[in-house]
Every structure is written in C-alpha cells, then in structure tokens.
C-alpha cells in the first residue's frame, strides 16, 4: 500500500463498487460506487477496469449455490469482504465463470471463528507436529492434501482435532506474532508439563495420547510412517511443556471465478473478451484447478495482476 501511494496511486477507501460503466461502444470505462453513508460516485478510466475483488468464501448464498456439499454454518479464514462482488457485477454484463463448485477448505483453523491464528508454535510447518482426535489418536498423515485432511477430520468425533507439539518449536510469540501465554490464559491453547496432564485438560485418555506421541517419535527416528504414510519429519515431541491447539476445518479459498484469457481479459459466454474488463486473483477461475496448492495464490496475483495491467494499458 505505502509503495503504491508513493507511485501516485489514489486509494478511495470505504467504498463499495456497485456496477461497471460502459461507453456507447460497449467498452468498460469505469465503475459506480457508494460510500458508507450511501453517497454515489463514478470513477472512469481511459484504459479499462481490473477486477481484483477476491473470492466468495464469505458469501453463503453464492457458496451454497456453487458448492452445496458445504454446510451454510461453515466459517471462513477470509476477511468479511470476500463476498464475490466482482463476480456478481461482471456476470451481470455477460461474463462467464468457471469452476465455481471448487471451494477449498483449510483443515486446521480455529474452531468457531475460522481464523488461521491461535497456534502455539512459532514455525508454521507440520514437520514437528501431530494431530490427534478427541480419543488421543492420530487419524491421518499430517502432510496430506488439504481436501484429504478435511475429509479425515469430518469423520472424527465432534469434527475438532488437536495440534500436539512440544516446547522446542514454541517462542514467546507464535507465527502470527500472538503472545502464546496469553492464548493459554484465555483457553485457546492448552499447556502442560506432561502428556498425561495435557490429556486430562483435553478430556482424552492419557494412554492414547502418550502412545500416539511415542509412535510419532519412533517414526521420526525411522523416517517412516507405516500407518498413514507421512513423509515430513523433523524433531520428536519430547521437550516439556507440551501444547495442544484445537483445530477445525474452515473455508479458505474459492478456486472458481471469472473466466479469463491468458491476457487476463474477462471472457463472455462465447469465449470473447469483454472490452476494457480485466481480472486477476481469486476473483478469477481456472487458475488452480480443483484444489489450490498452498502458497500458489501469491504467484497467481503477482503474475496475473501484472498481466492485467499491461493488457489494460495496451488496450488488448
């Protein structure tokens, strides 16, 4: 944001885009918008409009229509503005969509809120962590694809599982710069000097949790998971205190969206570009197939954002 401001970009905050503006030749030349109190505005451009409005994970109506296998009660990891407005507006003017039924669910979010935060560990990987159900048992390889992981969690009691790790990967602040001891004090994280005490706090059989950790420690030494086929290992879980973080699935990324060309032009239902309309990022579909790989959305927005800008300036 600061870099863009230095380059002369004029941000209009507190606005919601309502529609596109087209000239008499059918080219998109701007947008209409309203502010928080309902005042109406028009913004025009000589080069066109780039939609970068994100996905629709927070739009339950659109979500359920596109992916009815998801329950309306499911929360999302995303910010409240991920309501698919760009898709709604563009399709109003004939834009085509693709892959709208592909919605990715993140397996290990905060129960109830869907937030990614709230973990005990400083490091974000799973190499030093196991996940257990309410019975204290592992149920999946922790490095599984997200859709496989989610499917496995849904079969567990209550649909809630626990990250289990030791203090070797814990710092005063976690990977989201949250104070770990504060999270413990408010009950977001459980902490104990022994696995038995940790199991007691979680209401699970101590012998089951201890057995799961012992089994994992053997796997780390052998670099082999005979039960589930896990491939990623680093350190055993041996150093007290031990931590448990409740986790549950949360809607994370919508792979479907507007159909675009390789020049980031928004296409109509006949596969032809809508003049002056471009799109990049999660508002588009088809880039990530049926199941996005973690981190690839960054490459998506950087690549197609640049392509969209170049195409708009060139009036492609």
Regions found by a protein language model. Give the residues of each.
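Glycine-rich phosphate/pyrophosphate-binding beta-alpha loops
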Residues: 105-110, 147-150, 249-255, 283-298
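Internal hydrophobic alpha-helix adjacent to the cofactor/substrate pocket in enzyme cavities
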Residues: 86-96, 202-205, 210-213, 301-316
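Short Gly/Pro-enriched turn/cap motifs at secondary-structure boundaries
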Residues: 77-79, 118-123, 154, 247-251, ...
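A glycine-rich dinucleotide-binding beta-alpha-beta segment and adjacent secondary-structure elements
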Residues: 19, 208-291
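An anion/pyrophosphate-binding glycine-rich loop and adjacent beta-alpha core
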Residues: 87-89, 96-204
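Glycine-rich loop(s) and the adjacent beta-strand/alpha-helix scaffold that form part
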Residues: 36-110, 304-307
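Helical element adjacent to the flavin cofactor pocket in flavoenzyme catalytic cores
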Residues: 1-47, 87, 91-93, 258-259
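Short glycine-enriched, charge-decorated loop/helix-capping segments at active-site entrances
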Residues: 73-76, 181-182, 291-296
